Amino acid sequence: MSSLYDTMEPNVIDDDMLRNAVEEQGPKEEAGRIAKLEGIDFKHVSSLRLDFKNILKIDNLWQFHSLTKLQLDNNIIEKISGLDTLVHLVWLDLSFNNIEVIEGLKALTKLEDLSLYNNRISVVENMDTLSNLQVLSLGNNNLTSLENLIYLRKFKQLRTLSLAGNPLSEDDQYKLFIAAHLPNLAYLDFRLLNENIREMATMKYQYSIDDITHNENQEKRKQEEEEQKQRELDLHKAAYVENLNGPFLFESMYADDADGTKLSGLPGVAELMDSYRSKCIEICQNIFEYGMKQHEKREAEAFEFNECMQEAIRENQEQGAKKIQELTEKNSEILNELSQSGNQDFLDLKISQYIDDINKLLDSLMTLELQLVDQTEEIIKEYERNVSDMVSAFLETVQGLMAQVRDLENHHHEKLLEISINLLEKVLKGEMDDEITDDIRMIFVDKDTVINAVSASHDIHLLKIDNREDELVTKMNTWANNLIQKVQKDEIQRNRNRILEITTYIDHLRDELDNLELHEQM
Amino acid sequence: MEYLEDNKTETFEEEDKEREEDQVLDSDEVLDSNELNDMQECLSQTDLSNIDNNRAIQQLSLGSMEFPSYTTNSEKEEMLLGLADNFWHQYTHLYPDRKPLFMCPRNECGVEKFVCTTLHPTLLPYSDLYDWDQSAKFVSEYLTMEPLNPPLELPRSLFSSTSVLQKQSGNCFDFSVLLCSLLLGAGYDAYCVSGYATREMCLMDEKRNICPLLNKVEESSWEIPQKPLKKYTVKPPRQLISKFAVQQEAKKQAKMEEALRNEQEEETRLKEDAEKPGPDNLHGLRVHCWVLVLSGKREVPENFFIDALTGKSYATISEPFLGVESVWNHEDYWVNMQDCRNGCKDMKFDLGDPVCWEYLLQGGSKPLLLIPDEEDEEELNGETIQENKTIFQMPPSWVLPIVIRPKEFETRCPQGRKILQYKKAKHEKWAPYLKRDGHVSRLTGYLDTECTQEVKIQDCFQNRKDKLDLREQNKIEQVTTEYFIPGRADSLKVHEYRSLAPETERSMMFYSEARLDGLQRRDEKPVEMTEIYQGRADFLYYRHIVFGKRPKKVAIAGGPTEANPRPILKITERFNRNKEKPANEDVAERTFLLTEDRIQLRCHRKDDHITTSYWEFLKPANLGEKDTPIVLTPETCISYQVEPSEKFSKQLYVYETLVTLQQAEQNSKDNVRKSETEVREILATRAQEEADPQLTISIYDTERNEKSKEKREAMERAIQEERQRRAVQELDYLAPFLAQLGDPEKLTLWQAQKVKEDCLSDMKQRLIEKANLIQARFEKETQELQKKQQWYHQNQMSMSKEDEEAYLDYCSEAMFRIHILETRLNRHKDLAPQKYLALEDRLNKDPRLREPFLTS
């Protein structure tokens, strides 16, 4: 190609080139004639071949939305780009180009067959999202490092790999290394990796493979654990009681509270803190459990509602479909009769009868739909009422529990204040000189400072509690509102669709009849 | 007369007063002369029948009768007979009005035996007989029933079950004893009952009973499960109907229904009355014997009777059983003390209750009546245990073990066939392989009670090669239905037809899982065919074909029918939903109107829609022809789309769909032709199978499987031959020489030498003799030939042509013979020394002639 590169101007993918290619590769013979007459829409093209076109840059392919196979071989492409819109691609051929880096393939998650043969690639990389990859051709490139190929372990579906013509393939260990490290691979350089080679390879690379698998397993486990945690947290979040099943709230109270932390170091405060902490956690746990239970209840309610709704809609649909079915059967009979009979009066009679039938069908379908709307409206209202009841009950209980936390805080505050003042007196008398740290000494200067410090800590704590409560209440209310809105919106959407469908169908029937009449008269 | 009168009213009162009252009541009844005559007749038969019985005993010269237990009584048995005699004396003394008890009838050898010892509990090695119903069925089928004669008296004799099985017939007592033995052996708490029953029961007259096989199991009413009312279930739309009108309508309906029902009831009552048997003069007097099974063992939930003659079970309160005299099992004998005026309705079967039942031995395991007081119970238990030790134990049965061979078990009925008559039905049974076409049973249903007009015939088959299992013929509608078991090459399951000619009304069902095309059912009418499929990869489940009339065509003489197939007017195919395709593109119904060149497509309904997309294509005339431009007019494709999409409106799409549809149409047509051929083939096969029914024989059936039998016999023969051959081989070549010496145990050296020499010289002699013989023959032949030649030379001139030819023939033949003899002689000359040397060698090696074994 390089010789051509010097002599020929690079081409740009433009509309003419695409159109020519599409027409050339489109349907053949009679179908092709029709297609040409009609014009082919790029949107529906599923495979495209643009080889030997001297293309330098991949561009203007965004229209080919449903493309599954793309051949761009034997061009002078230097950089993979412009493929991000072709998400349905299964087959991509970029062989015999001048590509140096693998990139721009992130969006092609459905890709199964990728050919990068005869390019200038030196590292296998940037292919993390291609989890469906089955065939990979990387022959005649600049790959040098065997270690780099461990990257290919990611692709569990990979069956065929070709690497011949790379510097690394001259390595004696090349075949064994790959057989050992890619256990799912069936063909290497178009040759079956047989049991013998695999056995030898496993023996040879036993240790390194063990290491790798060990690491991989660990990573996998870690990932799974994280996912599990995330799932749990999501569930808690859905119940609006996240981070209430432990000391999070308590700890967050002290997180931004420097004075409080200092004060907790006072003698006698430790016990107080402990009891406060355990009580607070207990209440939080209560809130959490209650919240989870309520969440389950809400889910069950929603499930039941959806089920009933679906059932009603389904029944209604079936009735409607049955009516239409009946008419269709009658329709075909009438049409048959019409086509057979030549009597004008008889025809007119039949046609008027048919028109009546259509009108009747329209009426009955509309009645059915109205009826369904009435029915669903009723249950939606009921659902709304129930949901709001549930939400308010939940909020009330949570607020009550939160008030308990606040009481606890107040109680704690009083106790702390008492201890602090007692201590202050002692400090002022100089009895405690040895026992207190410098930090605390800073606070215990005079009464105001002490009280200020204690109240500041108290305020912070109350603020945290209030914030948490507010957050919960707001989220809960928003959820309730959104839910009802969504249900109503869906119902309206459904109703619109159905009416549209009915009218379209009736129009179609009438059109058909008109056409028929016209035809008869002609 | 008085006696009869008494008997007739006889119930087992214990109080004299009661009896008197009854008599007063009954004396009101006046017997008319007819009844008198009947009874006299019955009485006159009594003597005759006794003679019959005796003769029967004499005729039975059975092998088992030589067995001592049959001809004599053991000491214990004698004692038991004494006890029974004593009991009987007391009984007759206490209850002089009651009929004699059935205790000590004579057996087939004329020896008195106590009835309990006639029961021999046996468990036969057939799993079928482990349950009471199968046992009862077996007994009723295996034996032929002989009515009791006279019907009012107990039989004088009771045969052992072994001889009953041998002659395959018996009266109700024989039946019951056999069945009871089997049931006891299978672990049931079974008893023989001697008592009274209705005429129909005693004579095994089932003409008034509906055949049990005709009582079809009623389909359990399939109730639609009530949907649970959920919280958000929508309310049904309001019905705008007057409630009053509905009520009135309902009332009217109810009235009409009631009238109809009354009418029907009246009708059925009339019918029943007409079918009722005439009055029986001997009602309540007819002696019968049946089996009682008590609850408790083998998970029997409650007491019931089994009539051994028919093998049917009855509740203990059933009407046909009119009274019980006594019951017995292999352990004890009980006499009924209860009143049987109401039949067995009020009877209690708690045999431990001494008020209701009088026992003979109390040796049985039957517990005494349970007394609720616990303290007493303990005492009582102690007592019974003590008593039991002293009580007389029932001696073991005198009957030999009951043995039924597999072949007899399989053959069942005597001569392998049995006919049962029911109300409006006849049931015939045959043993397997008895009939050449594998027929094993036939149930014929009749329209009338006289059984003249057949309504329905049900034939069961077994072991048919064509897997035919059941054939039902409906004589009224002329419909035959054949059922097949799996395993046919064409997977046919059910075939319903009126005639075997093709292109008539029929319906075939198939084992769809065994067929490649998944065909489940094919219904045919003269011009229609419907096929139903199951589990196909292309989701096809229904195909309907309408045929047209055959166009007139000049028939090719003797040409096959395929030469002129029926034209297909219309093919309708329906498909199941293919979830992988969007509903708008998944075809639900495809109709090819072949005569109009039209194709209709209808898609599946999308989940949230009520309309379905459809297309109607008018095939352009030149579709499929190459190099001619096709004009696609708007009329080519008329469609309605639920969700209009650009893709479907394209001409290219229309064209491509048309092409695929045309292909599909051709395929469907081919399939229809294939179906037609298949039907014809099946019919031909069926006709052939019916004309020459063949039976399969299990490879495990050693009796019938000819091949395996032959093989086995051949094997036996081979073994036999092998044995003979070995015997011949062991023939000692030294024997004659040794015999000359008087067969000494061991030979001396001299003797050995002599034997050796003798043997060799004998061999030499024989070889020389043989050579001489051949030589002699050779010479004789040559001489004859020479003579002939001379004769020829002399008469050569005067010979006819035929003579000459004959001479030449003779010459060539003679030359051939001479040549053969010459060769043989030469060969013998060659071989003789070898043979001689071989013998010498053998002699030298013979262990008997070798040094170490010789006595010096």
Swiss-Prot record, chain B:
SUPFAM superfamilies linked: Cysteine proteinases
Pfam families linked: CEPT76_peptidase, DRC7_C, MORN_DRC7
GO BP field: flagellated sperm motility; sperm axoneme assembly; spermatogenesis
Location relative to the cell: Cell projection, Cilium, Flagellum; Cytoplasm, Cytoskeleton, Cilium axoneme; Cytoplasm, Cytoskeleton, Flagellum axoneme
Self-association and partners: Component of the nexin-dynein regulatory complex (N-DRC).
Family statement: Belongs to the DRC7 family.
Designated name of the protein: Dynein regulatory complex subunit 7
Organism: Xenopus tropicalis
